[in-house]
Amino acid sequence: MIELRTYVFLDSLQPQLASYMATASMGFLPVPGDSSLWIEVAPGMAVHRLSDIALKASNVRLGQQIVERAYGSMVIHHRDQSDVLEAGQRILDHLQTREYDRQQCVVMWNEIIRGVTADHATLINRDNRKGSMILPGQSMFIMETEPAGYIIYAANEAEKAADVTLVEARAVGAYGRLVMCGKEGDITEAARAANEALKRLTCRS
């Protein structure tokens, strides 16, 4: 039995998120403006068949595939939304399920820290080498989701809504983690947009 944990369609990858994803991509790199689909399933090995189905169904490119024992995730992208949606539908048909049967998103952590200190900023920057750096004095938005893949959707919608800097968007493992920084007003707006986006997702209860 394959469980659909995450199924998230991104209509247009924002510049920072696309670049961040490209730093970790082992496949074909996404570019800003691409449509993208992030799928996470359990058990992890099931993702191989789903990648095969998607790539044979349309012109999508496979940006990333991560296979763990418990969970497997895949990211496909293409400039044309219809190609991405067609590949996604073929996967759903194979699983004999619907998009809305994905697992419910639970926000495990959601907080804004204002006026980050120099010591704190340095430690965060040393720990993270894929995104941008946080500067002392900036405000920081941190979020954690379960399943992990939903954090990508939150990051994309937050970047659409405000002039913020993406520090981290980790969507692998049991929990997804997002870190963004910027001016206090911008961070407040980004946090609002991220939370509202996740609330709009229709999932099984």
Curated annotation (Swiss-Prot):
Q: What SUPFAM superfamilies does the database record attribute to this sequence?
A: CcmK-like
Q: Is Ribonucleoprotein tagged as a keyword?
A: no
Q: What is its main location?
A: other
GO terms for CC? carboxysome
The signal peptide stretch is none
Q: Where is this motif: Gates the pore?
A: 68-69
What InterPro entries does the database record attribute to this sequence?
BMC_CP, BMC_dom, CcmK-like_sf
Domain BMC circularly permuted: where? 3-100, 106-205
Q: Which UniProt keywords apply?
A: Bacterial microcompartment, Carbon dioxide fixation, Carboxysome, Repeat
**Gene3D superfamilies the record matches:** 3.30.70.1710
Query: Biological process (GO) annotations?
Result: carbon fixation
Keyword Repeat attributed:
yes
Pfam families, A to Z: BMC (PF00936)
State where the protein is found. Carboxysome
User: Tell me, what does this protein do in biology?
Assistant: Part of the carboxysome shell, a polyhedral inclusion where RuBisCO (ribulose bisphosphate carboxylase, cbbL-cbbS) is sequestered. It may control transport of RuBisCO reactants in and out of the carboxysome.
Subunit annotation: Homotrimer. Forms a dimer of stacked trimers, the same faces interact. Probably forms a CsoS1-CsoS1D-CsoS2 complex.
Which family does this protein fall into? Belongs to the EutL/PduB family.
Per the record, the domain comment is:
Contains 2 BMC domains, trimerizes in a staggered manner to give a hexamer; each subunit in one trimer interacts with 2 subunits in the facing trimer. Each stacked hexamer can form a pore of about 14 Angstroms in diameter. Dimerization of the trimers forms a channel-like compartment, accessible via an open pore. This channel may be large enough to accomodate transport of substrates into and out of the carboxysome.
Q: What is this protein called?
A: Carboxysome shell protein CsoS1D
**What is the originating organism of this protein?**
Hydrogenovibrio crunogenus (strain DSM 25203 / XCL-2)
Q: Taxonomic classification, please?
A: Bacteria, Pseudomonadati, Pseudomonadota, Gammaproteobacteria, Thiotrichales
